[in-house]
From Swiss-Prot:
This is DNA mismatch repair protein MutS. InterPro entries: DNA_mismatch_repair_MutS, DNA_mismatch_repair_MutS-lik_N, DNA_mismatch_repair_MutS/MSH, DNA_mismatch_repair_MutS_C, DNA_mismatch_repair_MutS_clamp, DNA_mismatch_repair_MutS_core, DNA_mismatch_repair_MutS_N, DNA_mismatch_repair_MutS_sf. The gene is mutS. PROSITE patterns: DNA_MISMATCH_REPAIR_2. ATP binds at residues 614-621. It comes from Escherichia coli (strain SE11). Belongs to the DNA mismatch repair MutS family. One of its GO terms (molecular function) is mismatched DNA binding. One of its GO terms (biological process) is mismatch repair.
Amino acid sequence: MSAIENFDAHTPMMQQYLKLKAQHPEILLFYRMGDFYELFYDDAKRASQLLDISLTKRGASAGEPIPMAGIPYHAVENYLAKLVNQGESVAICEQIGDPATSKGPVERKVVRIVTPGTISDEALLQERQDNLLAAIWQDSKGFGYATLDISSGRFRLSEPADRETMAAELQRTNPAELLYAEDFAEMSLIEGRRGLRRRPLWEFEIDTARQQLNLQFGTRDLVGFGVENAPRGLCAAGCLLQYAKDTQRTTLPHIRSITMEREQDSIIMDAATRRNLEITQNLAGGAENTLASVLDCTVTPMGSRMLKRWLHMPVRDTRVLLERQQTIGALQDFTAELQPVLRQVGDLERILARLALRTARPRDLARMRHAFQQLPELRAQLETVDSAPVQALREKMGEFAELRDLLERAIIDTPPVLVRDGGVIASGYNEELDEWRALADGATDYLERLEVRERERTGLDTLKVGFNAVHGYYIQISRGQSHLAPINYMRRQTLKNAERYIIPELKEYEDKVLTSKGKALALEKQLYEELFDLLLPHLEALQQSASALAELDVLVNLAERAYTLNYICPTFIDKPGIRITEGRHPVVEQVLNEPFIANPLNLSPQRRMLIITGPNMGGKSTYMRQTALIALMAYIGSYVPAQKVEIGPIDRIFTRVGAADDLASGRSTFMVEMTETANILHNATEYSLVLMDEIGRGTSTYDGLSLAWACAENLANKIKALTLFATHYFELTQLPEKMEGVANVHLDALEHGDTIAFMHSVQDGAASKSYGLAVAALAGVPKEVIKRARQKLRELESISPNAAATQVDGTQMSLLSVPEETSPAVEALENLDPDSLTPRQALEWIYRLKSLV
């Protein structure tokens, strides 16, 4: 029989626990008992495994011992962090009644629910990464997707049209928690993701969603937010907002608006492209040697998060980009002065979210005060910068002199971690608080004087006055001198080496101290809550200030990077094309111990595709990726690593670079490669930048070459995308002769004996050979194997002197022109003697031949 079925047989306290647990059956319940959070029954067993804590038993209830595990309240943040990182959610149940006045168990209630996507506590968050809660909805017309960063109030929705776009969004946003409807059809799209939460269908109803959102924003309709005609996105947003409210158990005043993210506003990159370009995560899953690792020297966590959002959503609006470029140029002479001051601002964005949720701690308010104290100097430094966008940011960041003054008066310089510890509110802020503190301090002084007086009066040098939470104040005398205690000393406690006593005078002062300390602490908590009430009316302006400071941090950082790393300002042109002079790979040039070989690139409507040949390790992939990264950097407004760059409009960036088996989905390397290729051929346009590396290598030579040729033809002739096409199929170097807008380039290498030197420089024309054996030798393949390979190569070349192609009718026939296999029907006819057939046999042969066709 389960605990809940045998409800009446339990003790009153366990009945209270079981009622609360029944409201949160799917998640762990932290049940506050004194100085511990306790977990019982299955929760205790689960927590014991997840947190590696002891599983014990507590007495008995309903005749059965109760499995129990507990954690001390002061260490709860560490344990919550571990659980959240494992995708768990926790309901925090606190004592809200007074034990002194309670009849039966102290009243308790769940005050908040901590989930991976709704955390705002500093200890639980990674400071330089967004932590998103997301919801996904699907109907016959496509998907709806909404994300919320509860630690900043940033609320977004979109309507991905197809599965590929939805997959790219999931990869870009990487939510910590994902809500989905119970009838969600495309489970393979989200399986294996962390923090999956199945929600009932009614939470996704469109009318409920509109009502929820209008109530949150205080509006009559959603037209002003530009989301009125996005029903699928609104369904997801409604569910998400309801979940956030349910878990936080409070209003969410910092969520003030919702924004529609449209495909046409940014350069679209699918999941494979984001992975291959290693924007914020390398192929091994780490953060080293990524584009963000080079570009992100921001000095505030909120600036770092904003830069990563820019990198994952490059904007197509050249007006915004030119404004950013102009700002970066204007700030280059001011970075050394601005960055140290900006560093002091800290993570104002997340502090404001905790303020809105009323969970901000004393040190949060101290940091907010410190941020306000930087504003006058920042504003003074920016005043001399000749740039309209910079001046707009300066105005947006505000001054908040009154709030700064309030916090300077209210909070001590270095407050304790928690307000319940007391000593947070500064002296002089509140007269009544000062009076209670003076009483408590005065009584403490008296007790010190009492100790000196009694020691002198009794002549007992081991006598001292002390305090503990159970017995209150006492006079302690060592066991050796206890027989000399005066007659008016009343024994209170006996210890191994000492006796403790009380006298009426001490008891009187104990009452006074405890009363004054209790009154002071209660008043301090009240004053602290009132500070929230004084700060929250300014929340909108404060959030705008935090946003402006984060943007300033990003732009100052990009200005510093441009100067330090010798980047130049790219020029935007109207027609499709990319012209790069002396381009460099932003990441590779930072990790090389030798100078990076810069290379040019020229793509235009008249030169749409480059067929890139050259040896493995020659630099083909680096050359292709650097082109995409330079384009990406240009479209976040950054300066770029080159001598000169002109870049036209780009709607999408695709990369088909490298592949591995997708064992989880049962897809081979070749299947993964072809799926990514199909996505490109279906979605690329003349404004797309396409990187194709080694198409067709996952299958037989003829099949692979055929596919590579057909893909290149389609991209060059039909789609007309700007394409870099790297290949080892030398037959493809004939494409420029057969099609307009295609050109050959190659990466150079020099071979000397058994060694090879990679020049890493891009030259016009096709490569003369692939240097495969030299690369194999360089990789350490045994010499006898290399020697045998050379023999075999000479044999093959002697059979087909022109290795790649054979001359037929004066034209060059590539491997594509393989003689067609003889039809079985033709073979059968050749072996047939019609003169020897009877009429019946002839009829049978007609049917047989028909079946062979």
